[in-house]
């Protein structure tokens, strides 16, 4: 009965949003923009539980841009080649917890961090420009990583985070998107929201971030990317269609696409086939020999 009541409530809310986007597109767009930059709070409790279940991890708080960022370290990134982990939207660093023993056994130190408004870090909102800035600042704090592993928005953001001063040697990017504008438009279309609300939606985001969607068009940056890259995407990804990942891989010079079936957007992070593919791609002898 609870599930039925919840479903009826969600359908009613969706109907009202669709109607409001037609009648009051300005306020509706602004409301949707606020939701767009607010991660799901429920994931914070999952992050806390994951930390309680973790062993051998060292936590540290960095204050970056006035935000307290929680970092997680295994090994010594100042002495060992390290892997930098970047989680996706409404997720947390310890989502990669199952990967840590294998990464450590290969001789890597590992660094993860919770984005603002995610996991144990402070803040209430986040957005792609801030994702990019945090990857840059955390990366520069710990130095050049031997490997960058990112999921979803964490994977897409690194395209704009790396520059001449800071660039990982090798990339593993799971379920990335090419353009944030495409994701936003797709969400509008899937929910049946009137396009008339999109103008105020983007205007509100600009007032918060000072950036336009057009500034984060991956198709312009991807052809300039350097370093071996493994792109992983599932054909049944409902959040970011497989075609986006395939295009991402095609635009990145020399990138390799690994496709999974039936794992969706999130479950592929836990699947042995994905983890094994990544470990083979980043094993030290592969990197030292630059074998793709």
Feature roles, as predicted:
Residues 93, 100-122:
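Conserved alpha/beta-hydrolase
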Residues 263-273:
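Catalytic histidine-centered segment of alpha/beta-hydrolase-like enzymes
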Residues 99, 218, 227, 241-250:
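Short alpha-helix in the alpha/beta-hydrolase fold that links the catalytic acid
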Residues 163-211:
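Hydrolase active-site cap/lid region
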Residues 224-226, 231-233, 237:
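Short beta-strand/loop motif that positions the catalytic acidic residue
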Residues 149-158:
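Gly/Ala-rich beta-loop-alpha elbow adjacent to hydrolase catalytic centers
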Residues 3-61:
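An N-terminal hydrophobic leader/cap segment in hydrolases
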Residues 125-146:
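Alpha/beta-hydrolase active-site loop
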